[in-house]
Amino acid sequence: MPFLAPPEPQDLRARHIGHVIVNTAVDRPWSQYFCCLLGGNAEYVRTHPVATKRVLRAVLKAADLCATEPDRAARRLVDSGFAPRYDYAFQTLSELPYDKWREYDAEDTMRFYALRLREAGFIKSGPQKIIADGTDWRFLNELKRELKA
């Protein structure tokens, strides 16, 4: 079964259909890396650095809200129509490690997934080339210092 986002996994579990093979939130080595990274158009980032940093700040503050107040975040998701059921939204927010963005190394995450994609034959470039040509950690590093909790 492919990756499923809420509410499908909860519905399947409630009906006792299938079983979890890999839970990237808890199973090593996957759990030691970010599941998602934010991407931006290089030209936009270059010409609009203030807006870029604001977007990233908003995403990181939203992650903090999900980590510290999953009940409030789940209610907002349901009230805004992004999630149909509060209990499923709350369960998802409570199970995912939203608070790890300060601890995990984004560059290490890129390296890890680039290696996996290369091993599987999906990409030809090595991790170092992808990191050198396609990443810019300045905004994240600045916000890690700025948003220390």
Where are these predicted regions, by residue range?
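Pocket-lining segment of extracytoplasmic ligand-binding domains
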Residues: M1-D79
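Generic secondary-structure boundary/loop-capping signal
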Residues: W30, C35, A42, F90, ...
